[in-house]
């Protein structure tokens, strides 16, 4: 995820779909294929579609009770030195409280994870960081979205991730080993927001049992937690890497993320219209932040004005987090 020119945006994305909406997503995907002369049972890519049919597809999806999350980074600004510096900082963060851990086994486990993270190639580290950021973003926002609209959908989290190769990739191996620790570290510094009056009963299987909340939260971080969600169980309970040809959901999100990438690179004939349509799939972020996460390893580089305008359009069109009464 590094390139020679600024503006070389890459992105990852996820589509949150409840069981009730799965058939509707598949229907609109099939209609898109048919309208462009393709067999519904096959795969299509954004390059095979007319711009008008693609944006109509996005508009059709926006009318469903589904949400898109995305993390994007400008590969042209991700120099090797900047990525390595960020990587070292993440390793330091993981090791920060290792001396306070009670059990030797736990300390050894953290040391092993930090070693594995430190030896990742920069490109793989960027890919892993974007994917972990995406998954944390999903959990931190999708729960409150569905707790208001379709609380029963929270009973089961099933993650289906695009498998790029038939054989197990270095990324899949790194993701399985390292993402739980990175997610855990993030959840401590950014606790999930729960809103009084929302219906969280569907999350019962993901809650720590009484008295089972990890004691290190209080001993190490000073957090007095009497209850909480087991983030690792939410993520790892049902996760599979699948070939996109076997998953209509993965095919749909592949088209969506391709559109986000093309829009940020300003390669649509009407980028503002594309930003407006894509923004309708996204979910409002707190503190008036963009609905998609923008990761930069170059803090001294402001977002280009043209891209900033497109992101603002997405913000203006995104789905509201809270139901209007």
Segments from the language model and where they lie:
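Phosphate-ester processing/binding pockets and catalytic centers
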Residues: 2-325
């Amino acid at each position: 995820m590094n390139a020679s020119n600024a503006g070389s945006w890459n992105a990852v994305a996820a589509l949150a779909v409840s069981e009730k909406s799965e058939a509707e997503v598949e229907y609109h995907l099939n209609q898109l294929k048919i309208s462009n002369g393709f067999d519904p049972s096959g795969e299509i890519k954004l390059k095979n579609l007319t711009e008008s049919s693609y944006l109509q597809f996005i508009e059709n999806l926006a009318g469903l009770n589904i949400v898109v999350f995305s993390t994007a980074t400008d590969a042209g600004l991700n120099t090797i030195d900047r990525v390595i510096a960020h990587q070292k900082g993440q390793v330091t963060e993981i090791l920060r409280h290792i001396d306070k851990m009670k059990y030797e086994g736990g300390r050894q486990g953290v040391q092993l994870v930090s070693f594995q993270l430190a030896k990742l190639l920069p490109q793989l580290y960027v890919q892993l960081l974007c994917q972990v950021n995406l998954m944390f973003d999903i959990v931190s926002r999708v729960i409150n979205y569905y707790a208001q609209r379709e609380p029963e959908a929270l009973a089961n989290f099933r993650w289906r991730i695009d498998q790029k190769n038939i054989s197990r990739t270095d990324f899949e191996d790194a993701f399985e080993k390292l993402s739980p620790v990175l997610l855990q570290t993030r959840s401590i510094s950014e606790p999930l927001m729960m809103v009084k009056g929302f219906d969280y009963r569907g999350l019962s299987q993901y809650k720590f049992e009484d008295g089972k909340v990890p004691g290190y939260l209080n001993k190490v971080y000073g957090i007095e937690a009497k209850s909480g969600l087991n983030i690792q169980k939410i993520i790892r309970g049902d996760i599979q890497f699948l070939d996109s040809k076997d998953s209509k959901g993965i095919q749909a999100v592949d088209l969506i993320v391709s559109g986000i990438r093309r829009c940020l690179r300003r390669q649509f004939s009407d980028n503002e219209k594309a930003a407006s349509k894509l923004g309708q799939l996204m979910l409002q972020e707190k503190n008036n932040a963009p609905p998609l996460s923008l990761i930069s390893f170059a803090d001294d580089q402001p977002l280009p004005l043209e891209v900033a305008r497109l992101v603002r359009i997405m913000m203006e069109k995104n789905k509201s987090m809270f139901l209007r009464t």
